[in-house]
């Protein structure tokens, strides 16, 4: 299926690793032009090179998105280079374990900057360009905004905020035909996730307990499965879809708990 994304300029935050990288490569395969935004330019450039190996075009933008000025500069770089923005994927973030007992005011606010506030700022600064292109926004979110996890107050609050902003923006941007949707991720296999698993005492046993709780095929979601949904939502093939929280999670959040293996 041709998603009609050829030469569309799409900004992807956290585009150098994991889900973001998979989205960048999926966009490139559709002929789109990804703007790879990440905190380490060396990592950004590696993914840019992968895009070029596919015969595509991309730019790499170094930005620490917890700094508001970097958000503005990242969008400006895309506009200075291409003169347009057709899509925005807000993806960057990290479950940093700021809990109710273990956290602090400073840690909680810092986590909101790392995980939520730049979602707003990137969309805010890209808005005029998205109005001009009648573009699309995809927010990557997490099950922690829905299910609770424990010891992750700030990240859960950020994901609840991401989901709320998705529907708020979908309403606000109706007059401009800008569609806004979110992809809710549960357990996705990424290098960051694998690094976390390896810090545990029994990584293989823990991973099996996790996958046993994923109803569809008892396996992790892949980054490519998230990416495939993202490029569809960015494309005009989803032209009447807005304000939706799309769960790409193997049934983790909503299917009956009785399906869990004992």
Residue ranges of predicted features:
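Conserved glycine-rich cofactor-binding loop
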Residues: 9, 14-17, 40
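Alpha-helical segment proximal to the catalytic Tyr-Lys
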Residues: 128, 171-175, 239
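Active-site helix of classical SDR
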Residues: 123, 158, 166
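Short C-terminal tail/terminal secondary-structure segment
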Residues: 147, 231, 242-262
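Residue(s) in the substrate-gating loop at a strand-loop-helix junction
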Residues: 142
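Substrate-binding pocket helix/loop in short-chain dehydrogenase/reductase
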Residues: 71, 99-112, 210
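C-terminal helical subdomain
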Residues: 182, 204-237, 241, 248-250
């Amino acid at each position: 299926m041709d998603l009609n994304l050829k030469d569309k300029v799409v900004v992807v935050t956290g585009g150098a690793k994991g889900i973001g990288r998979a989205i960048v490569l999926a966009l490139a395969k559709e002929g789109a032009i990804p703007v790879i935004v990440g905190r380490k330019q060396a990592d950004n450039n590696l993914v840019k090179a992968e895009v070029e190996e596919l015969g595509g075009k991309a730019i790499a933008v170094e930005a620490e998105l917890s700094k508001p000025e970097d958000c503005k500069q990242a969008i400006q770089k895309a506009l200075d280079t291409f003169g347009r923005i057709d899509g925005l994927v807000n993806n960057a973030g990290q479950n940093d374990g700021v809990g109710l007992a273990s956290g602090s005011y400073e840690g909680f606010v810092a986590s909101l900057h790392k995980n939520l506030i730049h979602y707003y700022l990137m969309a805010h600064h890209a808005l005029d360009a998205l109005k001009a292109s009648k573009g699309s926004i995809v927010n990557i979110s997490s099950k922690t905004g829905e299910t609770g996890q424990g010891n992750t107050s700030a990240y859960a609050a950020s994901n609840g905020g991401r989901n709320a902003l998705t529907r708020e923006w979908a309403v606000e941007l109706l007059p401009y035909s800008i569609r806004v949707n979110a992809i809710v991720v549960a357990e996705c296999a990424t290098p960051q996730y694998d690094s976390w698993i390896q810090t545990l005492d029994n990584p293989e046993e823990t991973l099996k307990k996790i996958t046993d709780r994923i109803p569809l095929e008892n396996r992790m979601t892949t980054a490519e499965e998230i990416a495939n949904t993202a490029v569809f939502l960015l494309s005009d093939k989803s032209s009447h879809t807005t304000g939706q929280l799309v769960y790409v999670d193997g049934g983790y959040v909503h299917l009956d708990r009785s399906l869990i293996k004992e």
